[in-house]
Regions:
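Membrane-proximal helix-loop-helix units in multi-pass membrane proteins
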Residues: 107-111, 115-168
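C-terminal ends of transmembrane helices
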Residues: 41-42, 92-110, 152-160, 202-210
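Cytosol/matrix-facing amphipathic helices and coiled-coil assembly/linker segments
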Residues: 12-57
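Hydrophobic core segments of alpha-helical transmembrane domains in multi-pass membrane proteins
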Residues: 80-86, 143-149, 190-198
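Terminal transmembrane helical module of multi-pass membrane proteins
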Residues: 156-212
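Helical transmembrane-bundle signal
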Residues: 58-68, 88-92, 123-127, 147-150, ...
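Selected alpha-helical membrane-embedding segments in polytopic membrane proteins
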Residues: 44-132
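Membrane-helix interface and helix-disruption motif detector
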Residues: 73-79, 133-141, 183-188
Length: 212
């Protein structure tokens, strides 16, 4: 056998470099990754709904029910429940922020945006009908209207959250239907059962099944 050349024993074999991928292929790969991320985000559910916050809303609603029942003034009755609505929104946002932070979840995610945009229209209609009923002295309709529209909003928003949330919305719609046709003497009981009892019951379920 012929002896090998010394250079061939010392110098490593140099392989040709792989040609870079064309820019079109890189752009297509980035588009595919972006599509996958957006699809996964759209299919995700919003799990930061706080069961403890929902229960706290139920407790404040019971306090509002007692205060409203003790007042003999119609404007005060409406004012108490308007304050309760604002307080409930604040409690809900704050407790969701705490739960999202504790679980390392983004609060303003794609499912969260869908929840807001699904929940807001029925609430806006409820505010408008409150003004109409107050103007025309149809305050006996307000408990039923409030719970029906709140239930519609919860059902619509709950499709992007955990499964128990839409069920809670249906329960509010059921109590709202009863309140709409019930005699005026049932107003306090319906408000306590709906905004108080249902929030407490479903809040406990959410806290137990979905981590707080």
């Amino acid at each position: 056998m012929a002896p090998r050349d010394a250079d061939s024993l010392i110098m490593p074999r140099v392989l040709p470099l792989r040609p870079p991928e064309p820019p079109e292929m890189q752009a297509r790969a980035m588009d595919n990754l972006r599509f996958i991320r957006e699809t996964m985000a759209a299919a995700a559910t919003f799990t930061a709904v706080s069961g403890w916050g929902t229960m706290l809303i139920g407790l404040t609603a019971l306090v509002a029910t007692a205060l409203a029942a003790s007042t003999g003034s119609t404007p005060r009755w409406v004012f108490i429940w308007m304050c309760e609505a604002v307080l409930s929104v604040g409690i809900s946002i704050y407790t969701m922020m705490l739960k999202a932070r504790a679980n390392g979840l983004p609060l303003w995610s794609e499912p969260a945006r869908k929840i807001v945009f699904s929940f807001a229209p029925p609430m806006a209609v409820g505010a408008l009908l409150t003004l109409v009923c107050y103007e025309h002295r149809l305050l006996g309709l307000l408990p039923g209207v409030w719970m029906l529209l709140y239930g519609v909003g919860v059902v619509a928003a709950g499709t992007f959250s955990v499964r128990i949330v839409p069920v809670m919305g249906v329960a509010f719609m059921a109590v709202g239907t009863v309140a709409l046709f019930a005699p005026p003497s049932w107003t306090t009981a319906c408000m306590a059962a709906g905004f108080g009892g249902l929030h407490l019951y479903f809040g406990a379920l959410i806290a137990r099944r979905h981590g707080g």
